[in-house]
Amino acid sequence: MNKNDSFKVQKSKEAKSAPEGNFDNIKSKYIVKQIFDNLPRNILLKIILRNKKLQQRVDVDIKDYIEYSYVIIDIEPAQNVYGRFINIINEEDKKYFKIYFDGKNEEINRTILYKNERVQNIRILIKSNMQNFTRLFEKCKCIERIKLQYLKQRNYYEMNKMFNDNISLKEINFDNNCEINIKYMVYMFANCPKLETINMDKFNTEKVVNMSYAFLGCKSLKELNCSSFNTKNVTNFHGMFQDCSL
């Protein structure tokens, strides 16, 4: 697809002539809103986080659209696409997104991607050397199921508060392909009152020194598989299972 085709999903002249990547003025934001308003129902939202750059690209793959198969929007900063703009996509019914991360991103802990309270199902496919998942799903109030695949690499992940305050979360599925080396997990599953089962048998915790409040407030937790845990270096277990049903 050519660079100038980015906004042709929206048929208006304003959208077709819109400058790419300029989200700092009201006109551009309005055009993006119009594009999202006109997206077909079946979409694939792809967020690419570029190494050492704040600029981010969002590819929206419009499966039911014949003439133009997708749009590319350059975004800086990420806040301009989530929040109310993504809410617009989900007003008709609950959508199922596949999010792809490509490239290491140091800023992931500062960009909570799922502020959208309408999304209830999210699937994450990670095929990069991304390491920092701090607060990635924090305060996702309506998400019920999360599935993570292809977490397999030599690096160690930072997962502090990764699922913190997911008050509706019932299921977290780490795919069989996952091999997770974790370094930080403070408050990782804290305040997930509806979460019943967590399977962490793919986790290597030999580098973890602090597991405090990891399962705080998991009041419905019935099963926790942590058979692979190595806690020889852990020095802080404070509140790890506080207010937890286990």
Label the model's feature ranges.
Residues 242:
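Short, well-ordered alpha-helices that flank and scaffold nucleotide-derived cofactor binding pockets
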Residues 1-105, 111-117, 121-130, 135, ...:
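Cullin-RING E3 adaptor/co-adaptor recruitment helices
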Residues 164, 190, 216-217:
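Predominantly recognizes leucine-rich repeat
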Residues 13-16, 188, 203, 212, ...:
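N-terminal cationic amphipathic segment used for targeting or macromolecule association
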Residues 43-48, 64-68, 120-128, 142-155, ...:
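Structural signature of tandem-repeat unit edges
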Residues 33, 134-135, 160-161, 186-187, ...:
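Register-specific detector for alpha-helical tandem repeat solenoids, activating on a conserved position
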